[in-house]
Amino acid sequence: MFETVIGLEVHVQLNTKTKLFCSCPTSFAEHQNKNTCPTCLALPGALPVVNKEAAIKAMRFGYAVNANVNHTSIFDRKSYFYPDSPSAYQITQLSKAIVQKGELFIDLEDGSQKRIGITQAHLEADAGKNMHEGNYSKVDLNRAGTPLMEIVSEPDMRSSDEAVAYLKKLHSTVRYLDISDANMQEGSFRCDVNVSIRPKGQEAFGTRVEIKNINSFRFVAQAIAYEVQRQVEAYEDGVYAQEVHQETRLWDVAKSETRSMRGKEEAADYRYFPDPDLRPLTVTQEMIDEALVMPELPDAKVKRYVEELGIKHYDALVITSQKELAYYFEEMITQGAVAKTAVTWLTSELLGRLNKAGIEIENSPVSAKTLGELVAKIADDTVSGKGAKEVLDHMMENENRDIDVIIDELGLAQVSDDGAILAIIDEILENNQEKVEQYKGGKEKLFGFFVGQTMKVSKGTANPGKVNELLKQRLNS
């Protein structure tokens, strides 16, 4: 039996207005090489200046994960030769990162939590972009110098499920902190996976393989599963030393397999040394105060939702998994929606319709205010639950319409007047005398028949609670 050992390196693109070491804008939609300057192009004499906003965002992350935020950190040069790096080095942090020794807690299927250590989070500059067309290549340096925060975990994960849970928690955290849009498809949240296996009980780690630049949670799980199986088979076949090397591999989406990219470099291969153009980054009290201003994070929200709003722990996890979902839920509550009912209508009714239509919650045609009002109207018996579903369907197709107008137009206003409901009940009982006698003779299952007939005649608008109450009065009199 083998134990899987997983560590993750996540590159988060910080949502600053300008690049890490110059004042060029960070937008990529511009014409190629438009957002560049002598610093981006590594022209002689151009000197870097640290982006204060990027440092504060990294610090805010550090405080959020209970890490040590170093008041002095060092920038280093990482030497390598690629066309998308005109300086032939990357400015990063190796010797002393701005954030060290943090932690993140993931939720396991059994309801417990597991601590995942964070070795460090450091600032570094992104490279440009190579574009290959036919038999020639072009380089776009608009992206060069964009601020990245690389978050390095401890090798604390033991399965692909734990790795994905950690990634999702990390993704959620940086979005709540508003330090990155963390768009995986656009590359602003990308992951390198380090995988090894070892016989259970063995302390020494096996040979570590790195899988580069995976941009979806699903692909992370698939890549880990494939790589673990490859290493296990090599071990069992007695060819582990020959086939499993410390190397960098790529995840081939089309073939659903990892394939060798290059031998894994060690730190010495990159010839790291302190950047002579940058003084140590010194944190001021003003920067600390600004970094400590942060929103309520997912774990705190879960605790509050469970303890104060009385919703289930699982439901709280679902709602807080996305910042937009949590804010939507809270807006529903401010509109008078009961928390437990709001959970059902948000996670089942609305999300079900949005998923079917391929719409994200932030683009929902039904606002949180509107859905909150609708749920409140169910509670005060203005409309039945069944009728409210029709109203929601209508709102999905017709934005910004008044709920009361929709209820009136569709004839869905719930009838709670005793007299109106009794009139319907009396008519039904009069037309079904034989069944009334059977009910009174002991066939109590017929009660459901009378309820159904009443709801049918009222076209679903009669208050179900009132119908049950008044029917019992009539049948038992």
Swiss-Prot record:
Catalytic reaction annotation? L-glutamyl-tRNA(Gln) + L-glutamine + ATP + H2O = L-glutaminyl-tRNA(Gln) + L-glutamate + ADP + phosphate + H(+); L-aspartyl-tRNA(Asn) + L-glutamine + ATP + H2O = L-asparaginyl-tRNA(Asn) + L-glutamate + ADP + phosphate + 2 H(+)
Domain of life where this protein originates: Bacteria
Q: What is its EC number?
A: 6.3.5.-
Q: Which SUPFAM superfamilies match?
A: GatB/YqeY motif, Glutamine synthetase/guanido kinase
Stored Pfam families: GatB_N, GatB_Yqey
What InterPro entries does this protein's entry cite?
Asn/Gln-tRNA_amidoTrfase_suB/E, Asn/Gln-tRNA_Trfase_suB/E_cat, Asn/Gln_amidotransferase, Asn/Gln_tRNA_amidoTrase-B-like, GatB, GatB_C_1, GatB_Yqey_C_2, Gln-tRNA_amidoTrfase_suB_CS
GO MF annotation: an example: asparaginyl-tRNA synthase (glutamine-hydrolyzing) activity
GO BP annotation list:
glutaminyl-tRNAGln biosynthesis via transamidation; translation
The reply on keyword Transport is no
Alphabetized, the UniProt keywords read: ATP-binding, Ligase, Nucleotide-binding, Protein biosynthesis
> Which Gene3D superfamilies does this UniProt record tie to the protein?
1.10.10.410, GatB domain, N-terminal subdomain
According to the record's subunit comment, the protein's assembly and interactions are: Heterotrimer of A, B and C subunits.
Q: What does this protein do?
A: Allows the formation of correctly charged Asn-tRNA(Asn) or Gln-tRNA(Gln) through the transamidation of misacylated Asp-tRNA(Asn) or Glu-tRNA(Gln) in organisms which lack either or both of asparaginyl-tRNA or glutaminyl-tRNA synthetases. The reaction takes place in the presence of glutamine and ATP through an activated phospho-Asp-tRNA(Asn) or phospho-Glu-tRNA(Gln).
Provide the family line.
Answer: Belongs to the GatB/GatE family. GatB subfamily.
Name of the molecule in the record: Aspartyl/glutamyl-tRNA(Asn/Gln) amidotransferase subunit B
Give the organism, scientific name: Sulfurovum sp. (strain NBC37-1)
Q: What gene is behind this protein?
A: gatB
